[in-house]
């Protein structure tokens, strides 16, 4: 029959063009089939170029048929090639392996035709064609490496099936030659399940494209739709297309069909030749969203957007403007595209917390757009630092230049020093004393306000690296790597430590003066008194401005530990300037002993003194460590 010969020629040309040896698809051509057979028989010579091919054949598990399955062909005996495929019985979840015959690309037409057209008891053909699901199910039960896309393409080129699907927009049958219109076949997405809802959608899309062509030929520059109607139509099309793209595929078939259908879709050239008015861009969009060869359950049960016009489909799928449209349409498309971009940027920016929330609260008037961009980049760096635990010092100090890089190095050394002196490096951060962790974070926030959001993550990363180095057997007191330190960073670190020491001394003097000037009648309630002055005495005198090139940072120190307890971080970083406090403590205790016959300190004061003593000892260790590192730096420089 003439129509069948034309159908065979067109389908065969498409198969060779799409699944041929030149295409990067996971299908088996005649040449590849014979090569696999030779490799399994051991007749193919070993070379370096076929090592990858041998590995692929071995991984797939190709097998030759049994001797009784060897059948004679036109040119002699032809061996049958099988491949194991995982299958399920449809009831349980147990998978089993079953052999499927390898389908050759050159035989796709004969295989699909034999499964699609039913035959009678005597071998005669019955004019009864199976549907897409039944055809593909029968093929998948017997063959492998035959993608669903080829089955759908075959059914869409079958004249009998097209008559049954009523694709003709006029409602009449096709011509006697049975050739489908090129416009219809170009609009079909061959990875979509051929359901009645899909066919109705394609029919309406074809009608809309013809109406758009007629209107554009008569009045190309006229825009007769009202503003609200046009925008609502575009928005409805946008939402419908987004819903189609968000539908999750349903896994119905084996892995070899998924790979072949996903990788063979790039060879379908008929989709690229469809005109803009016929909605080719929309069909290409749906093809991309379903290119894995799987069908969505929602697509079988719910009809698609039947009011979807090719013009709006092109707009929503590609987010670009057609230059051939009228000025009025371009105006509303520009508005829609700008709204979409603003919403997308708002969602992206809203998912990230601002990096400097504390400092930007006091210096919000000095913030700029450049500062916001830098904050987001810093925040992304923190997320990477949390994700990758295998880096010892994961701060990207080389990505920034000048003062920022040096301050980042100083910040890293600042955290390392305070962790070494105050925390047990073999204990995770979740099991460390929360007061000590908070004290280190507060100190980092005072001295390096631009990196305040990194403090906790930096502590956690350093503790992880210490535990990892301990397991590896390295020395824990290793020097800081050369790429993480410099002379400028050391000077910044020294300035930060000195500033922290002065601040600690100032806070302790203010607390001691407040304690001495407290009324005698409130001594019976030491807890309440210390809680009040620890939060009221310091803010008025602790206004420190930090200028770092991106804005002015203003920090107001608020004691968060309460109870009159000495800040452990302040005590650990307090240097020799705090020796005057010891003398003040002695004189105050002497005056109290002279006034009272029996000198006695409260438990809170005793605890504060003990912590002060521990702080001085830790400060001495800190100074000794700093001196050793500075000496090592001098030796490295010389």
UniProtKB/Swiss-Prot annotation:
Composition bias type Acidic residues, residue spans: 211-225
Main localization of the protein described in the UniProt heading = nucleus
The UniProt regions of compositional bias labelled Low complexity, in chain numbering, are 588-597
Q: Where is the composition biased (Polar residues)?
A: 229-254, 263-281, 302-312, 351-363
Pfam families, alphabetized: HTH_NOL4_2nd (PF23079)
Tissue expression summary: Expressed predominantly in fetal brain, adult brain and testis.
Bias (Basic and acidic residues): 364-374, 391-403, 503-515
**Domain of life, source organism:** Eukaryota
Q: Which residues cross the membrane?
A: none
| Keyword rRNA-binding annotated | no
Q: Where is this region: Disordered?
A: 210-312, 343-403, 503-535, 573-603
Q: What's an example GO cellular component term for this entry?
A: nucleolus
Q: Which InterPro entries match?
A: HTH_NOL4, NOL4/NOL4L
Localization, per the record, is: Nucleus, Nucleolus
Signal peptide location: none
Q: What keywords is this UniProt entry annotated with?
A: Nucleus
**What protein name does the entry list?**
Nucleolar protein 4
Q: What is the lineage of its organism?
A: Eukaryota, Metazoa, Chordata, Craniata, Vertebrata
